[in-house]
């Protein structure tokens, strides 16, 4: 019991000292820095050029979908790499688990493909127009 308490005490001291150093560094920098704001320092810096337009730019949702799909398969590689390094020691059950894991991700990729999220240039949809009722003459 005493050994466990001393181990947790070391972790607590480490966290406490880390917090003290971070807060102390922040406060020291805040107290010692010069504060001389002027319009030139407060202006938006954009690669050495004057800013044009606003910074609120609307991005197409396809950027986010492609980024999420990339992150999902990047994380898959992170999970499968340790499995691949010790594959012979784990046996058939681990192989089946890895295949199920990859299969679930492949089903998700197929769903995104069928839905059209992987098509960068989408064709314009052909929406049939509804016939308009005749207008009454006044």
Swiss-Prot record:
Keyword hit for Oxidoreductase: no
Localization annotation: Cell inner membrane
InterPro entries, alphabetized: NAD(P)H_OxRDtase_bac/plastid (IPR023043), NADH_UbQ/plastoQ_OxRdtase_su3 (IPR000440), NDAH_ubi_oxred_su3_sf (IPR038430)
GO MF annotation, one: quinone binding
Reactions performed catalytically: a quinone + NADH + 5 H(+)(in) = a quinol + NAD(+) + 4 H(+)(out)
Transmembrane segments: 8-28, 63-83, 93-113
Keyword Signal tagged: no
UniProt keyword list: Cell inner membrane, Cell membrane, Membrane, NAD, Quinone, Translocase, Transmembrane, Transmembrane helix, Transport
Topology in the lipid bilayer: Multi-pass membrane protein
Top-tier EC class: translocase
The protein's Enzyme Commission number: 7.1.1.-
Any one GO CC term of the record: NADH dehydrogenase complex
Domain of life of the native organism: Bacteria
Any Pfam family the entry gives: Oxidored_q4
Family: Belongs to the complex I subunit 3 family.
Subunit organization: NDH-1 is composed of 14 different subunits. Subunits NuoA, H, J, K, L, M, N constitute the membrane sector of the complex.
Function: NDH-1 shuttles electrons from NADH, via FMN and iron-sulfur (Fe-S) centers, to quinones in the respiratory chain. The immediate electron acceptor for the enzyme in this species is believed to be a menaquinone. Couples the redox reaction to proton translocation (for every two electrons transferred, four hydrogen ions are translocated across the cytoplasmic membrane), and thus conserves the redox energy in a proton gradient.
Name of the protein in question: NADH-quinone oxidoreductase subunit A
Gene name, Swiss-Prot/TrEMBL: nuoA
């Amino acid at each position: 019991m005493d050994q466990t308490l001393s181990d947790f005490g070391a972790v607590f001291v480490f966290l406490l000292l880390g917090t003290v150093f971070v807060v102390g560094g922040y406060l020291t920098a805040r107290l010692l820095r010069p504060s001389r704001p002027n319009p030139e320092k407060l202006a938006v810096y954009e690669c050495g050029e004057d800013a044009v337009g606003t910074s609120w730019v609307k991005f197409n949702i396809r950027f986010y979908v492609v980024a999420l799909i990339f992150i999902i398969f990047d994380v898959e590689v992170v999970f499968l790499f340790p499995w691949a390094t010790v594959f012979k020691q784990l046996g058939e059950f681990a192989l089946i688990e890895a295949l199920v894991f990859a299969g679930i991700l492949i089903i998700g990729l197929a769903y995104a493909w069928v839905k059209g999220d992987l098509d960068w240039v989408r064709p314009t949809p052909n929406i049939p127009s509804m016939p308009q009722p005749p207008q009454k003459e006044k």
